[in-house]
């Protein structure tokens, strides 16, 4: 197949290109050439900026277009309209499109709505990420119809992760000592290895799948994630009382059931997830990110407060 990747050199895009090349597909990358430009030297590279200059794509079509970073609806619409003669359009959205996580929604769950708010203004930062992604989905479906494949990942983890949101845990395990973690250990954490997601997406394109898919694992108990470590489990109420930041200060943690979704559809369509140890090893090579994760001092303070309360 002939595939066009919008981006394709950072995290998920990079993994998709690697998976596609491993399967013998022909790739073209369209990006600004500013991130990891040295990657994939034998792949055709078109330079431009999807917000202002799509001229390198004019008059061309591919078997599938893969859009990993669309966020502004008008920008996504322009690329979809220009590439409408391509076979299908694969848009990477997010489970953040759901209006709430009161239950683990399947793909028909309620999505967030911006109402009458001015989209252009709201797109200037990431505080409206979910609703804007939902609008981007609609733009793609409006142009490509049943040739659109909408992928809604949860937290993506693994090699080359630039966010630090999962990387904190393999790094923390490697450091050893007493580890603070959110109780109960039976609570599930949902995430997907970037390599598993990329391989599924490339295979889904080859199989001409369409429609919407929640794209994450069925879930791993926290106790399994931290198996073998010296863990002190503390309840949500304690973490909230001491203003521990969800998701970023204590990665993966959101009070209650967290960001869980129903993944029955993608599992039925052959999403394969590798062993946890392999995912942890892959993530361990990614760098820490400043401001993500508990500092050793903050963790020690919280552990001391917890033990004093429990004495």
Q: Model-derived features: where do they sit?
A:
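Mid/C-terminal beta-alpha module of Rossmann-like enzyme folds, strongest
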Residues: 200-256, 282-284, 289-311
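Alpha-helical substrate-binding/gating segment
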Residues: 170-180, 187-220
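N-terminal Rossmann NAD(P)H-binding glycine-rich loop of SDR-like oxidoreductase domains
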Residues: 3-23
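NAD(P)H-binding glycine-rich loop region in Rossmannoid oxidoreductase-like domains
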Residues: 9, 34-87, 91, 97-99
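Conserved beta-loop-beta element that borders a ligand/cofactor-binding pocket
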Residues: 136-160
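Glycine-rich Rossmann NAD(P)(H)-binding loop
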Residues: 6-7, 158, 182-187, 213-220, ...
């Amino acid at each position: 197949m002939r595939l066009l990747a919008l981006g394709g050199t950072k995290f998920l895009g990079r993994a998709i290109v690697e998976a596609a090349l491993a399967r013998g597909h022909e790739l073209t990358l369209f990006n600004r050439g500013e991130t990891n430009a040295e990657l994939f030297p034998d792949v055709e590279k078109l330079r431009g900026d999807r917000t202002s200059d799509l001229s390198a794509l004019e008059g061309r079509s591919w078997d599938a277009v893969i859009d990993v970073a669309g966020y502004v609806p008008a920008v996504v619409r322009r690329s979809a309209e220009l590439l409408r003669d391509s076979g299908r359009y694969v848009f990477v959205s997010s489970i953040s499109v759901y209006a709430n996580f009161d239950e683990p929604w399947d793909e028909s769950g309620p999505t967030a709505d911006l109402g009458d708010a001015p989209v252009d203004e709201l797109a200037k930062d990431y505080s409206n990420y979910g609703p804007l992604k939902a609008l981007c989905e609609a733009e793609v479906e409006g142009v490509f119809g049943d040739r659109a494949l909408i992928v809604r990942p949860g937290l993506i983890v693994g090699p080359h992760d630039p966010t630090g949101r999962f990387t904190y845990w393999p790094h923390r395990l490697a450091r050893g000592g007493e580890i603070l973690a959110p109780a109960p250990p039976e609570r599930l954490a949902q995430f997907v290895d970037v390599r598993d997601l990329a391989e599924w997406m490339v295979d889904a394109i080859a199989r001409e799948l369409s429609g919407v898919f929640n794209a994450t694992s069925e879930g791993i108990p926290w106790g399994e994630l931290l198996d073998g470590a010296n863990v002190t489990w503390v309840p949500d109420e304690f973490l909230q009382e001491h203003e521990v930041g969800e998701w970023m200060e204590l990665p993966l943690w959101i009070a209650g059931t967290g960001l869980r979704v129903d993944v029955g559809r993608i599992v039925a369509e052959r999403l394969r997830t590798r062993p946890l140890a392999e995912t942890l090893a892959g993530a361990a090579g990614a760098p820490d990110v400043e401001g993500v994760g508990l500092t050793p001092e903050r963790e020690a303070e919280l552990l001391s407060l917890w033990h004093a309360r429990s004495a």
